Amino acid sequence: MSGKWPGGFIKKTAPVVVGPVDGEGGTASGIWTLDQAADYEKQGLWPKPLVPRELWTWGNGADGANGQGNTTSYSSPVQVGALTDWSKVSLSYKSTVAIKSDGTLWAWGDNGYGQLGDGSTTDRSSPVQVGALTDWAQIAGGREFFTSIKTDGTLWAWGRNNFGQLGQGNTTSYSSPVQIGALTDWSLVGAGNEHVLAVKTDGTLWTWGANDQGELGQGNTTDYSSPVQVGALTTWATPAGGGETGVSHSLCVKTDGTLWTWGGNGQGQLGIGNTTYKSSPVQVGALTDWSKGLGGDRGSACIKTDGTVWTMGRSDSGELGDGTTVDKSSPVQVGALTTWADISRGNRFVIGRTTGNTLFSWGDNDTGMLGLGDTTDRSSPVQVGALTTWNKSAGEMSNALHSVAFQSP
């Protein structure tokens, strides 16, 4: 007997072992589960983690961003509460929004534009639930706004909307989630500084929000307050945005493993060997083994299917991880490791997890966002403690000044 999950994935009633897998960073070695579960989670539509997850945080604690009931910055990881049912998390500038395994949505930190989604503009230093719904599946944070996909394939947004990044056809900020259109075929979403990229189940790519650097990929620099399609291709897979202080760019991997970038490029963050801005997607090299690309403040970090990590763009704080503070306009490899499982790119720093469930960090560290117990920048990866129980790093955190990661209890 068999059936289908939403999205067309085959459902098996007989258990199959999935292990080791990397659903979205979560290792499930030795866990009995349905086949395709990892792929389902990787698309952001699987609401439950494959293993129990504690949520840990560190870095800039302004406005309660670390969820500790205070505004203290921490240079070493601290746990957010005592729960072990966290599933997904994304960071904004000084805010955090997370999804639990029961599909509920929680938020804390800066709320000046309603980016916590709780109907107010009051900062929260501890997690508060956003509404009572239990169908949240995926989350992505921009500078002071968030977007989320529900299990029914609808897309929602809230927070700051000065460039139309909430996709409402206006520039009004919202302190509670509002639906973007009426479609139910959204698959993946990524957010940059003040813009959004989203892929539908048909593989088409859509963008909206700020566009002064061409970050929407529309061949122009016109802002859009409603979703507009990028070209006519149906082969887009994993979207991500990056940027800070009005310099934004975008990255997306296609289903064939090629990497494409566009937008601001003043420090080589597009990885195309120059510093020329591009308002339409351009391919980064000719390789077909890219897995994911992430953007930050004028820099990018990408992971390949062979487990290597590559970076490009700004590096004045060592965020390229190549042992220098020199900008690079073409991808450079971070060390020689081939065991990177997933990465997260913050404002000017990177967090990476290996297949051995160790956590590493590098780049800017002025408020302890590297989790190393100090505030010294690092230009090469340094291990965060000695634990081997990290099972997932954060998702979207392109504008964040703090960090989060998951541990197995």
Which residue ranges define each predicted feature?
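Enriched but not universal
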Residues: 1-58, 397, 401-409
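Conserved core positions of repeat-based scaffolds
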Residues: 57, 95-98, 107, 145-148, ...
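Tandem repeat domain/solenoid detector
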Residues: 85-88, 101-104, 135-138, 151-154, ...
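Short glycine/serine- and acidic-residue-enriched loop/turn motifs that recur at repeat junctions
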Residues: 56-75, 108-125, 159-175, 209-225, ...
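Surface loop/turn motifs at the tips and blade-to-blade linkers of beta-strand repeat domains
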Residues: 80-81, 130-131, 180-181, 230-231, ...
